[in-house]
Curated annotation (Swiss-Prot):
The keyword Ribosomal protein does not apply. The keyword GTP-binding does not apply. Homotetramer. Signal peptide: none annotated. This is Probable methylmalonate-semialdehyde/malonate-semialdehyde dehydrogenase [acylating], mitochondrial. It catalyses: 2-methyl-3-oxopropanoate + NAD(+) + CoA + H2O = propanoyl-CoA + hydrogencarbonate + NADH + H(+); 3-oxopropanoate + NAD(+) + CoA + H2O = hydrogencarbonate + acetyl-CoA + NADH + H(+). Transmembrane segments: none annotated. The lineage of its organism: Eukaryota, Metazoa, Ecdysozoa, Arthropoda, Hexapoda. NAD(+) binds at residues 169, 171, 195, 198-199, 248, 403. Pfam families: Aldedh (PF00171).
């Protein structure tokens, strides 16, 4: 039985018995093998719906992290010299294996992260789409050639890998974000040292089993676990040439600065405050349904969650209808059929969310839907927050200036579209935004004037497919190249430009030319 099936069986077994300190340990993945850590420091991973421990994650030792890095270095020498078709074949096989095992991956994500099974499958699917895009690597990594730039002279460019790269992934998308990282890195010829979130390690470990089955050589991807020491190791190791990060502002800025000072290329996706602008001419029913789903789906724990709504003019009369829709959403454990909103990731997250809700009330916002005291029968120890709506919020309130990252929608009001655009552009974040309207001229004005990296027109969560790139801007991103798509290929590669001269007359002896070359 493969590791995927073993872990799936263990998860089902754990669900049937009482939890104990005898929870299984998560392994490191080094040189193609799952390795038990020798550390004496462990992190408990809790099922957010039950608060019960499902696994223990090691804080990898310095020796273990160094061993993983040495394995990456060794593998790069051979992997980068493999034909591009060989690397493509690994992606073809990985794509098929992920499809076959999507159910097991989704169950693991729900157990460790809490999101609904349907949302967990979407998590896997959006990552799978990046793998599918990587199957086009012979075209994506193609260089350029100009023949006869001068007489008998040709110039061409090669798109080459960097070397050892690293990825630091967040808790909210246990499969999708690692799949943003390692497939692009390794298909372009790099190797990768990957650190998944210590809160949700399981999906990454399942993906490593599938990567082995796909025929990826040992050491091309290694996985370490940990917290600050692991991040510092990645930022400081001179052998690592590039670091990909998705997560919080604090961690993202830290990694960007520390890794950058050490000469590494960095892409850092960070926080967001995504606004939905609702105009009075929008399709009311569709707009309110999309707004509720985008605000409260995944318990609001998406970097592209529509956490802020700006109702313009006559659309302000729709706010009570939005509350009614939010009240109908079912809050329960993620594996329970029919669940719309699962738990948040931890007790600390729940407390932070509740504190931000309370701060809004104290600063004058109207709490028109309060989900703080929700109780889910059978899951009384879970980390649940029900859909919550704060209205009459102003840009100076803490609930607006900080990313809540929970099932909380803050509502602002504006008289005109110009006012709404001004609100969005004054916010320091620039990850995503959306406008809801049936007026093409209004939509075009919004698209042209809004200062955000990803814009939806009647699309609440405009995350691009992998033929494009995830293009957050301003306070939501630091770096030069974004994730996946053409920019993702650029991030993990470097260009070597070759100019070669083969004169026809070189077949005979000629006199040396000492004048400055003029390229004529």
């Amino acid at each position: 039985m493969s590791l995927v099936r073993l872990i799936g069986a263990e998860a089902r077994h754990l669900a049937k018995r009482s939890y104990s300190s005898a929870a299984p340990t998560t392994k490191l993945f080094i040189d193609g093998k799952f390795v038990e850590s020798k550390t004496n420091e462990w992190i408990d991973v809790h099922d957010p719906a039950t608060n019960q421990v499902v696994t223990r994650v090691p804080k990898a030792t310095q020796a273990e992290m160094q061993a993983a890095l040495e394995s990456n270095k060794k593998a790069f020498r051979s992997w980068s010299n493999q034909s591009i078709l060989t690397r493509q074949q690994v992606m073809f096989k990985l794509q098929a294996l992920i499809k076959e095992n999507m159910g097991e991956l989704a169950k693991n994500i729900t157990k460790e992260q809490g999101k609904t099974l349907a949302d967990a499958e979407g998590d896997v699917l959006r990552g799978l789409q990046v793998v599918e895009h990587c199957c086009s690597i012979p075209s994506l990594q193609m260089g350029e050639t100009v023949a006869n730039v001068a007489r008998d002279m040709d110039t061409y460019s090669l798109v080459l890998p960097l070397g050892v790269t690293a990825g630091v992934a967040p808790f909210n998308f246990p499969a999708m974000i690692p799949l943003w990282m390692f497939p692009v890195a390794i298909t372009t010829g790099n190797t990768m040292l990957l650190k998944p979130s210590e809160r949700v390690p399981g999906a990454t470990m399942l993906l490593m089993e599938l990567l082995n089955e796909a025929g990826c050589p040992p050491g091309v991807v290694n996985v370490i676990h940990g917290q600050h020491d692991a991040v510092n190791f990645i930022c400081d190791a001179p052998e690592i040439k590039a670091v990909s990060f998705v997560g919080s502002d604090q961690a993202g800025k830290y990694i960007y600065e520390r890794a950058g000072k050490n000469g590494k290329r960095v892409q850092s996706n960070m926080g967001a405050k995504n606004h939905g602008i609702i105009l009075g001419d929008a399709n009311k029913e569709n707009t309110l349904n999309q707004l509720a789903g985008a605000a409260f789906g995944a318990a609001g724990q998406r970097c592209m969650a529509l956490s802020t709504a700006v109702f313009v003019g006559d659309a302000q009369a729709w706010i009570p209808d939005l509350v009614e829709r939010a009240q109908k959403l079912k809050v329960n454990a993620g594996h329970v059929p029919g669940t719309d909103v699962g738990p948040v990731i931890s007790a600390a997250s729940r407390q932070r969310i509740n504190d931000l809700i309370e701060s809004g009330v104290k600063e004058g916002a109207k709490l028109i839907l309060d989900g703080r005291k929700i109780t889910v029968p059978g899951y009384e120890d879970g980390y649940f927050v029900g859909p919550t709506i704060l209205s009459d919020v102003t840009p100076s309130m803490k609930c607006y200036t900080e990313e809540i990252f929970g099932p909380v929608l803050v509502i602002l009001k504006a008289d005109t579209l110009d006012d709404a655009i001004g609100i969005v552009n004054a916010n320091p974040y620039g990850n995503g935004t959306a406008v809801f309207t049936t007026n093409g001229a209004a939509a075009r004005k919004f698209v042209n004037e809004i200062d955000a990296g990803q814009v939806g027109v009647n699309v609440p969560i405009p995350v691009p497919l992998p033929m494009f790139s995830f293009t957050g801007t301003r306070g939501s991103f630091r770096g030069d190249h974004h994730f996946y798509g053409k920019q993702g290929i650029k991030f993990y590669t470097q260009t070597k430009t070759v100019t070669q001269l083969w004169r026809k007359t070189d077949v005979t002896h000629t006199q040396a030319a000492v004048a400055m070359p003029t390229m004529k």
